[in-house]
Amino acid sequence: MPSYLVETYLARRCAGERAVRDERARSAAEELTRVRFEHSIHVPEDEMCFFVFDAPSRRDAALAARRAGLDPIRVVKALSSCTPITDNANGEEQR
């Protein structure tokens, strides 16, 4: 399943709020059967917080973010060195 990066604003002085947002993101994803919250990354210097969701579409990831009250700035498809790659020949996942 593709991963999506949800970009949000989180002030440097509010860094402690990230854990609360993580829990809201996790709960919102659990309400949507095809979405999974993976983790978040806070960049205090830039006052940005990124939430990673696995979802079948950008729309589903954005819906989870909105339900969590994350107020997304943008939602983009993301690739990671941890993202499984599917071998089309036999359908097995490889890293």
Where are these regions (language model features)?
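Short, well-ordered beta-strand segments in beta-rich or mixed alpha/beta enzyme
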Residues: 5-8, 38-64
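Short S/T/G/P-rich N-terminal loop/turn motif that feeds into the first structured element of a domain
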Residues: 1-31, 43, 81-95
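A short linear hydrophobic-aromatic micro-motif
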Residues: 34-40, 74
